[in-house]
Amino acid sequence: MYKDLKIKKILVALDGSENSKRAVDYAIKLGQELSADVMALHIVPAGKYLPEQNLEKGTKHDYAYLDKISEQSVSAGVDLETQIIKAESSVIDEIAEYADKENIDLIVIGIRSVSEFRYMLGSTATGVVVNAPCPVLVVK
């Protein structure tokens, strides 16, 4: 049934937390092992950087974070594309829509703990698992 299952495009959803750093490590390692491309996506929640001057400062910080991830992927020999998107809807919907639009084969996302996955149905990771158009690997 899964003989032809090929993972060629991996999306790692980032928020700058320790959890997402572990997710990046997994995504890059998987990309290396599977010869897959990795896309690192950071979504800025609507209204996070208000007033306008904070948006610029926040975006500079976000790009610096993504640059560091790019360096990590280059060291591992993995093609990595980074992108920052300002959420027009929920972060969960943005991740699912991006994965669908880009024909992603696997989403990798971090989570704080197993108890969060079981009990916090409103969490981003749980929402992505429920709404994603492809398999999701949850990293704790």
PLM region descriptions:
Residues 53-61:
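Alpha-helix N-cap and loop-to-helix initiation/capping positions
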